[in-house]
Every structure is written in C-alpha cells, then in structure tokens.
C-alpha cells in the first residue's frame, strides 16, 4: 500500500516536470526561431537495461539509490522541425528554409565573446554599419561561421540597398559584399540550448555545410503549435489529478487501517 503512495507521487512529479517544459514552450510561442522541447519517460526496466550496459563505473563502489517499479522522466529533448516563415519585407530580416543555423558573436555579461548559433534572423544594421541581432550581437560571415571566428563580422553600407540571395550572398550597389554565415551540424546531440533561441556547440560536435536556403524579408517563427500544447496541458492536468485521488484514497485506507482495524 505504501508503494502505491510512492507510485502516485512519482507520477505527479513527472507530470509537473512535463508541465514545466510545456509552459516554457507556450511562453516562447512568439519567440523567433524557438524550437519546442519535449520529454520522454522511462520505466524501471528501461533504466535497469541502461544501467546494466553502462560499464563506465565498473569496479567502483556505488551508492544506494532509489529503486521503484514506477515511471521516471527520461530526458528533455529539442524538436528541430521547421518553424513557420513570416513575411516582414524588412531587407535585413532573413529566414532559413531547411537545416542550418546563423552564426553570431555572442558577448555575455562578463564581456566574454564566443560563437553561438541561432535560427532567429531578425537582424539590423547598427550605426557603425555592422549587421547585428536584436540584442546587438554581431552576425558572422561564412568564413567566421565555418572557422568559429567571432571577429569575422559583416559590415555594410547603412545607406545602400541590401539584397540577399538564397545562398546568403549580400549585394550592395550590384557588388558582392560578403556572405552570411550559415552552417549545420553533423549530430544535433552535440549542440545545447543557451537561453531560448541560441545554441552552443559542445565538445565532439562537428560543423558541416548547410543546405538551407536563405529567404530575405522573412523571419522564422517558433515551431510551437499552441493548440497541441494546450491539449497536452489538459492531459497532464487530468493525470496529475488522478495521482492526487490515488494518494487521497491510499491515505484514507491507511487511516482506517491504523485507527479502526488496529483497535480490534
């Protein structure tokens, strides 16, 4: 009977974690280039199989952990499906149709600059003529993106018309100026989210060429389907309530067992 309490409790904890992920998706439904997240669940048998195959800690003393026959949250993953393309007619706005990421020189609050990647192509030209993100981070050219060089910035004439073709080549006054840095990755398991719509390349990840087409005058929205997320929220709410009812039922049964049957 006590096991029933633990099973219901862990189920409620899992639903709460799923709800946290879901609400974050809904909060970023209007964030340019945002990729929604999802969760997976693992049964005791799944976790046991993984543990048996894992020999990384072979021969080491293992601490006692929690063993139960219920379901645990496996992992949180990112869905990289294409988001909707929105037309803005802004000549510095660009969207990617296909797999790939823009490369930017991101500077954190400590003043440290590193190369990060994004699908958010809502760019603008600053007063110095550099192509930057809405947060003021510099957009890199193709060489900078391929070589992870944060100093390979794109500088334009702010007074001349900007034309960008499908390859990302930027023209001004009928002359090729540079090319927007667009790259892809060999394995998306080697990139991690930084904030809401930026990505880091982690150790072991490899940069590859992108086959994405650049669309000028457009931006990519998030790939969050609000209706789907709301349906999931209702399902989670019902599952959470079911867990509460189980706990209440077990609690009432235990109360009768201790206070009534125990007196006999």
Language-model features: where?
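Amphipathic alpha-helical polymerization modules
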Residues: 1-264
């Amino acid at each position: 009977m006590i096991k029933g309490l633990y099973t219901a409790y862990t189920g409620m904890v899992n639903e709460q974690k799923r709800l946290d992920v879901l609400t974050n998706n809904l909060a970023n439904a209007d964030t340019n280039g945002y990729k929604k997240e999802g969760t997976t669940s693992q049964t005791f048998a799944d976790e046991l199989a993984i543990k048996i195959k894992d020999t990384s800690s072979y021969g080491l003393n293992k601490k006692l952990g929690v063993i139960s026959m219920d379901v645990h949250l496996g992992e949180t993953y990112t869905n990289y499906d294409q988001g909707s393309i929105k037309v803005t007619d802004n000549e510095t706005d660009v969207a990617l149709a296909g797999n790939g990421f823009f490369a930017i020189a991101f500077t954190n609050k400590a003043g440290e600059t590193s190369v990060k990647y994004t699908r958010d192509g809502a760019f603008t030209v600053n007063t110095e003529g550099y192509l930057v993100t809405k947060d003021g981070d510099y957009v890199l050219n193709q060489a900078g993106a391929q070589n992870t060089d944060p100093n390979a910035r794109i500088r334009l004439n702010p007074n001349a018309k900007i034309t960008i073709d499908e390859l990302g080549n930027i023209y001004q006054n009928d002359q090729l100026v540079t090319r927007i840095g667009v790259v892809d990755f060999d394995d998306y398991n080697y990139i991690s989210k930084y904030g809401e719509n930026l990505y880091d390349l982690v150790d072991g990840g490899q940069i590859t060429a992108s086959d994405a087409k650049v669309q000028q005058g457009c931006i990519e929205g998030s790939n969050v389907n609000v209706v789907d997320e709301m349906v999931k929220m209702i399902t989670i709410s019902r599952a959470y309530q079911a867990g509460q009812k189980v706990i209440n039922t077990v609690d009432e049964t235990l109360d009768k067992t201790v206070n009534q049957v125990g007196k006999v």
